Amino acid sequence: MEANPDDIADAKTSAFVEALKQAASREGFDICRITHPHAIPQAPERLRAFLDNGYHGDMGWMARDPERRAQPAELWSQVRSVIVLGMNYAPAEDPLPDLRARDKGVISVYAQRRDYHEVIKKKLKNLARWMVAQSQVNVGVDVKVFVDTAPVMEKPLAAAAGLGWQGKHTN
């Protein structure tokens, strides 16, 4: 009996996805999911309504290039998959008790640590290098990494990948 090429491809893909999740975990990511770049067909309409209603407030940058923002393929035409990763960046200790001490100022938690953009981007680049190295065996890979710094709708993509949900009245 001859092996079905689709079954072989599915097995290779499954093995790669599992290896990817393990590599992401080694980099400190708590969760790793993959979705299709066209998994958020409602995004352009929802983004347009959000902008038309002025919900973006003073964030004028959100209104620039809404088509690129709403669909990953508009931002990068060669995109085939979107890997969505999550990392808990919370402090080890609960900062809320500090707020009860009214006689002293409190520095916001995010300002006490290294900029998460830098921390996470370094880890993403390490993971991207791992992916490229793995692909040398089979087929070439090109990877783009973003840490909420590109016009990508992270929330709908995360929901499409199975990382929670997005509320009706959120951007």
Predicted regions and their residues:
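Auxiliary alpha/beta "docking" domains used to position bulky ligands
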Residues: M1-N171
